[in-house]
Structure formats: structure tokens, C-alpha cells
Amino acid sequence: MEKVMLAIGKFKEGEGHFEKFMSFMQSEEGMAERRKVAHVEKTVPGILPDKSGVMFKVHVHDEQAMKEFVSGRNPAMKPIYDECVESIQLFELSEVDIG
């Protein structure tokens, strides 16, 4: 079952963490790992103006793997997580009828 989630990440202090993180996420390895947990073509990104953090609206098809991915427990994600990420929060989203 597909679940829509919001991941909000904060980077460690210092220069270049945003660029390094995004470079990994857009690399072949990063894209392959993302495809294992979510539909990457449906992902909607957002960036804080000072590049100290990011958020992604993600359509997840493997919730447990997503939790491992954003927590740094995924072996492919761990090195970039350890170097660049201070924290990531994960939220479940549900659509609200405004009509």
C-alpha cells in the first residue's frame, strides 16, 4: 500500500552538506536506493532558504525501508547520513477535503 509521507531533514553545521547530500540523492546509487522505498517520480522536494535543511513529500511503497533510509540504518545511506545529516523527522500525510 502506498503511503504519502513528509521527510524533514536538518543538516549538520558547516559548509557543503546540502550539496553533498543532494549530489548523493541524485546519483545512480542514491536513486536506486530511493526507488526501493518510494516512487521517486512522485517526490516533491523543498529546500530551506539558507540550505540548512530539506523536506520531501514522498509516496512510499515500503514504509519499514523508508524508516531505515531516513534514520541512517540503510547501509548505502549511512555514510552520507553520518557526514551530513543532523536529524530527519518523518510524518504521515493525509489529504484534507476542502470542498
Language-model features, listed with the residues they occupy:
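Short S/T/G/P-rich N-terminal loop/turn motif that feeds into the first structured element of a domain
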Residues: M1-A76, S87-G99
